[in-house]
């Protein structure tokens, strides 16, 4: 079995619900949860994602899966889903040769390449 490490990650986060005593922003809750999950590099959350946070977090009961993409310098949050979908993380590996193109489906969590 061949394995490969991708440039994206999906992580399930069970965030604490805001209270009068804990008034951290939604963004701060996510960044702290990512750090607790082992993401030590900088994470950028684009404005288009920030606009989706509160309605989605509230509907999801503060249990979400975030998708991160590595841009060569830092992680970028590219998607947010309700619940735990972290196991559903697939990608394509593409080899562009001089005469052929080979494409393989891979499980981005395990790195397993499906032949």
Give residue spans per PLM region.
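Nucleotide/phosphate-binding catalytic cleft detector across ATP-hydrolyzing
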Residues: 1-93, 98-100, 110
């Amino acid at each position: 079995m061949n394995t490969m490490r991708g440039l994206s990650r999906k992580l399930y986060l069970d965030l604490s619900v805001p209270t009068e005593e804990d008034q951290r922003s939604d963004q701060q809750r996510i960044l702290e949860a990512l750090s607790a999950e082992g993401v030590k590099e900088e994470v950028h959350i684009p404005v288009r994602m920030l606009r989706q946070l509160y309605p989605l977090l509230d509907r999801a009961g503060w249990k979400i899966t975030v998708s991160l993409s590595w841009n060569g310098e830092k992680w970028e949050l590219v998607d947010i889903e309700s619940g735990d979908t972290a196991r559903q993380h697939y990608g394509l590996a593409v080899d562009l040769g001089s005469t052929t193109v080979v494409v393989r489906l891979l499980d981005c969590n395990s790195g397993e390449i499906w032949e």
